Amino acid sequence: MTKDLKMYIRSTFIILSLSLLVKLIAIYITNFDLFGDEAQYWIWSQSLDFGYYSKPPFVAWIISFFTFFLGNSFVTIKLIPIIFYIISGYVVYLLSLELYNNKNQAVLTAASFYLMPAVSFSSFILSTDVFLIFFWSLSLLFFLKSITNPLKINFFILGIFVGISFLTKYAAVYFLISTLVLIFLDKKTRTVFIYKSTNLLIFIGSLLLVLLPNIVWNNNVGWITFLHTSENAGLDRALINLYQGFEFIFSQTLMLSPFLFVIFIFKIKKITFSFQTKFLLSFSIPVFLIVLLESILVRANANWAAVALVGFFILMINQVFKSSKKIIFI
């Protein structure tokens, strides 16, 4: 490990610890109430079900779990996203390690992930994106394990995690779209998922097993959540607006870190089209493009493509630090 790298890791973890400490202190000393969506999720948690009007049920379940053990308080609610992002950072570490087999880089990636503007800001807010990012990351990890070690149990666990992702937010459908993209791009993925059809059936079976209660609930209430999601998308009001598209792209660079993104752009020509690159781009670019199109046609909030940040950020950090002789701390 180089002297610069040691200094970077030390500095990063000092700032990481200070950031966590500041967030915990802010939670304890603030007198703010829960904002609209947080309050709504808390109300749902008082009456558990397999679905709700505008969201799948996981957010209510997890609030109920934490408040049962820690009590119904502002502090408890605000602790949840912080805890989940810390665990997500560890999953990102495992993902980077699985992809590049470099512990130093994996540590840097995980620490940088937690300090990424999107994560730093949203760790103060209890949103469904917090849980989707966590289970999306776990799904990516077991997708990798399923390809490198195609045991039946890995496909079963993959289906479970993707299913839970759907229970956090229906945007998890992007995972299935991205899977199809990677199957098209990568021969080994095609072999594992298509030519060995038992693996695909196990994956689909465990996915549906997790989703079944929510599907039944939606059927019983006239698919109200899907109707709400469709209305929220507003594609029936489509009108091309390129400015909104540029606005969305700008918001994504802010969420990633403008400085790291600019460095990445300068290093982009050195990217090799390896399996790692195909994997990470397959689970990021399709999501960005879909939401970008929606932003041009109707509108799109910056967080609608949040899951794409996981794969793209890992690739970006790999390229920045691999191509730079000197470690750059942002």
Please give the residue ranges for each predicted region.
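Transmembrane-helix signature of polytopic, membrane-embedded enzymes
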Residues: V92-L115, I133-F134
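Short helix- or helix-capping micro-motifs
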Residues: L16, A106-P117, V162, F166
